[in-house]
Design a protein with these regions (language model features):
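Intrinsic-disorder-associated interaction segments
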Residues: 12, 16, 31, 51, ...
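Amphipathic alpha-helical interaction modules
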Residues: 34-73
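Exposed alpha-helical structural elements
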Residues: 22, 34-37, 57, 76, ...
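Amphipathic alpha-helical binding modules
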Residues: 78-116
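A composition-driven signal for long, intrinsically disordered, charge-rich low-complexity tracts
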Residues: 5-14, 61-64, 85, 103
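Short terminal alpha-helical segments
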Residues: 2-47
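Short interaction-prone segments
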Residues: 12, 61, 70, 75-86
């Protein structure tokens, strides 16, 4: 379950700043087909923030999509994440599901560390 970014590998795009505009631009460059979902979630997060008088929904939204970009800017990591998600969903037993879920966590950690 060794997860790493190969030495000398370059991301497809630079990691965006943690702002809605920068993250949206990265999402558009990485996969324009998810922009409708991004926009819908942004609208929901801002409405929730307004209703709750809290910045937390917006902060969670930005963090989620920032991490999405952190993974997808490395195509091999993104492919491995999709495969682990499939393995977890189709696991025949709890141990297989846990192993796939643990690998998902490691992929997210590696991507976040590389983006920091």
């Amino acid at each position: 379950m060794e997860v790493s970014i190969p030495v000398g590998a370059q991301p497809v795009v630079a990691q965006p700043e943690r702002t809605p505009v920068a993250v949206r631009a990265a999402v558009a460059r990485l996969d324009v087909t998810v922009l409708p979902r991004f926009e819908a979630e942004w609208t929901a997060a801002t409405a929730q923030a307004r209703d709750e008088y809290s910045v937390m929904p917006v902060r969670h939204f930005i963090e989620k999509w920032w991490l999405w970009a952190a993974v997808r800017r490395w195509p091999d990591l993104a492919a491995r994440l999709r495969e682990c998600g499939r393995r977890s969903a189709e696991a025949a037993d709890l141990m297989d599901a846990r192993a796939a879920s643990a690998e998902i966590g490691e992929i997210l950690r590696v991507a976040a560390d590389a983006a920091a």
